[in-house]
Curated annotation (Swiss-Prot):
Organism (species): Brucella canis (strain ATCC 23365 / NCTC 10854 / RM-666)
UniProt record similarity statement: Belongs to the tRNA(Ile)-lysidine synthase family.
Subcellular location: Cytoplasm
Signal peptide interval: none
Reaction catalyzed: cytidine(34) in tRNA(Ile2) + L-lysine + ATP = lysidine(34) in tRNA(Ile2) + AMP + diphosphate + H(+)
PANTHER family linked: TRNA(ILE)-LYSIDINE SYNTHASE-RELATED
Keyword DNA damage attributed: no
One Gene Ontology cellular component: cytoplasm
Protein name per Swiss-Prot or TrEMBL: tRNA(Ile)-lysidine synthase
EC code(s) of this entry: 6.3.4.19
A GO BP annotation: tRNA modification
Domain notes: The N-terminal region contains the highly conserved SGGXDS motif, predicted to be a P-loop motif involved in ATP binding.
Taxonomic lineage of the native organism: Bacteria, Pseudomonadati, Pseudomonadota, Alphaproteobacteria, Hyphomicrobiales
Primary role: Ligates lysine onto the cytidine present at position 34 of the AUA codon-specific tRNA(Ile) that contains the anticodon CAU, in an ATP-dependent manner. Cytidine is converted to lysidine, thus changing the amino acid specificity of the tRNA from methionine to isoleucine.
Length: 448
């Protein structure tokens, strides 16, 4: 008996979408996904449009022909297909990670262009096991949050859901399904290239591992991650736990923090460091432990700089403080009609007709600006403005948005951005992200 498309796909609610993107490389996993998905959508009364998208990473001479062959197969079976190419210069290091980032960027753009609510990928149970083993080797200990491996659901760029419905299906089961249907697949030779981490794990430790035992460890890691997340969600429900000012400085109640378990404390302070620093990832396990020890008073320093964030321990009941350090702050152009993220912390949209540069003000420049506008603010607020975005026009400081009573250029909009959640949000962390956003908010106000 073959695999059941209804059992595989129904839990994901694909039927509510206008269109669904299937990421198809031509390998057995993605082709198995495509044809099972096609069968499932045919059972729906008003099915979404199925669009197969092949990303040609331009890493091998054969890739263009392979993408073309996927298109011919789709044409034969009445499936829409398009090819997207990664034409950017390829990095000398971190090629696999860069290719993955480019692939998802292209897939998200394809989904937005098609009005698709879902991108569906063919990650299998084998991939899940490999991911666990890769992350375990990197982390060096079993408490790492990443050992929960891949989530069946993720949210990409805040708008497109990534579904991985085959995480409980083996690669061999998909190949048996394709063989039964008489459909051939292509084996990418890079999958056997041990210069890359995943093939090295696949052909080494994963081949010798007890798959069922690994899956049990994944479940245990997932449960631990859920416990820590739930503790933070509960803590964040209390408004006294966490506060924020306009520039993004966060104030963590020391007593609320101390009441959490060590694992939850490490997660909480690591998360706030990532938000303050505008980073897409948590600090590593060792860094999170270091932050927790400092805030808990186990280590002598009262200040740490981690991940672009300056973290200060509160004393005598004062809150712990998290803010951006004043280094490596970017300068970006903001032209009419443009939507950009500045420093991973603020999102700007220019619906007006003027162009600006966004950058932090210099200290003397800010002092002169305040003097010329007849303003006088205390030192703490001035320091906050120095790590906040300002608007320049024609090389001249035109506006300091977070200054009390500041005049904003017409058509310029700003809101808070959470880089750790707004680009790739694993389903494991949906509730945590909602709790953080509810407490910190998106709207930005003046520094008062």
């Amino acid at each position: 008996m073959g695999l059941s498309p209804v059992n595989i796909f129904k839990p994901f609610g694909l039927g509510r979408a206008k269109a669904v993107i299937a990421a198809v490389s031509g390998g057995s996993d993605s082709l198995g996904l495509l044809f099972l998905l096609k069968d499932y959508l045919s059972t729906l009364e008003s099915p979404p449009v199925l669009i197969a998208v092949t990303v040609d990473h331009k890493l091998r001479a054969e890739s263009a022909l392979e993408a073309e062959n996927v298109g011919l197969l789709c044409q034969k079976h009445g499936i829409m297909h398009c090819v997207l190419s990664w034409d950017d210069p390829k990095p000398a290091h971190g090629l696999a990670a860069a290719a993955r980032t480019a692939r998802y960027r292209l897939l998200v753009q394809a989904a937005r262009d098609a009005g698709a609510g879902f991108i569906v990928t063919g990650h299998t149970e084998n991939d899940q096991i490999e991911t666990f083993l890769m992350r375990k080797a990197r982390s060096g200990h079993c408490e790492a949050r990443g050992l929960a491996a891949m989530s069946p659901r993720s949210l990409l760029e805040g708008s497109v859901e990534l579904a991985r419905p085959l995480l409980t299906v083996s690669r061999q089961a998909l190949r048996d399904e394709l063989t039964r249907r008489g459909i051939a697949w292509v084996d990418d030779p890079s999958n056997a290239n041990i210069d890359y981490e995943r093939p090295r794990v696949r052909l080494g430790v994963a081949a010798e591992a007890d798959g069922q035992e690994v899956l049990e460890q994944i479940a245990q890691a997932g449960a631990a991650r859920e416990r820590d997340n739930a503790a933070l969600v509960e803590a964040l429900a209390d408004p006294a736990t966490l506060g924020v000012d306009a520039a993004g400085m966060m104030f963590l109640n020391a007593d609320c923090y101390a009441a959490l378990s060590p694992g939850a404390r490490q997660l909480f302070s690591g998360l706030l460091a990532s938000i303050a620093g505008g980073r897409r990832f948590l600090p590593g396990d060792g860094e999170r432990r270091r932050i927790e020890r400092m805030l808990s008073g186990q280590d002598a320093p009262r200040r740490l700089t981690v991940f672009g964030a300056l973290i200060e321990r509160g004393e005598k009941g004062a809150p712990h403080r998290f803010r951006r350090e004043r280094r490596n702050l970017p300068k970006l152009d903001l032209v009419p009609g443009q939507h950009i993220v500045w420093d991973g912390r603020f999102c700007f949209f220019n619906s007006g007709g003027r162009s600006f540069e966004i950058a932090p003000p210099g200290r003397q420049e800010l002092i002169d600006f305040l003097k010329n506008s007849g303003r006088d603010i205390e030192s703490r607020r001035c320091e906050a403005l120095l790590i906040s975005p300002a608007l320049y026009e024609g090389g001249k400081l035109a506006s300091v948005p977070f200054l009390p009573g500041a005049e904003w250029p017409q058509g310029v909009h700003i809101e808070r951005h959470f880089a750790i959640f707004d680009h790739v949000l694993p389903g494991h962390d949906f509730a945590l992200a909602q709790a953080v956003e509810a407490r910190l908010g998106r709207a930005c106000a003046e520094i008062s």
